[in-house]
């Protein structure tokens, strides 16, 4: 049985993404309160696998997770793109005329602003976790309280769903990365089946340095799908570039990496994996 470390509780979006990615397999969740703890679990147990959100189509990139990933010594072995939907739920005996406040993670509250604006009497209360809000209401029997979470979390904790799909944007997706100890990578994904890679590097503070790297990737027909820059602490106006690329020829991709190494500083391959499927 695979042991999967996630940030959040049972019923969280990380939980749902993990079960969809490992669909058909038995998994055991290691629920962590922080992303740092996710990586710590992998460090302590080389057989553990981690799953962490890295970007959202509305909220953008989770910048801190890029730093954790680079420093962790783990490697990316997969990804999953999850359609994010929100429901409002409460205790079975409550209803619209009895709830007075709604609890959820601040990002979830933000993603349901239009819906909440239609219910101006509801007090919005920020919490650490969407599923955690549902669990708190269920276990504490908090009458008059509602939670915004995934419908699966409501079912799991025995709450009643007042309304489904209350998110403002119906095309909201979060991309999750699957990470592991590098020694376990080949068991989790055959290298010959990969078509995507994540790399990080810095560049000399010279004119055109980034464009030269991108030109070489283009020459080798490597498709750039994402680039994210983060400042290097203590080095003014110097940046780390986190780049995702896709390829259909592993040998040509490896040649492109060899070609850009002399133009970059501290290039590191964060993982080679298969482009993840998108689930609704």
Predicted regions and their residues:
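Domain-level signature for soluble enzymes in the chorismate/prephenate branch of the shikimate pathway
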Residues: 1-280
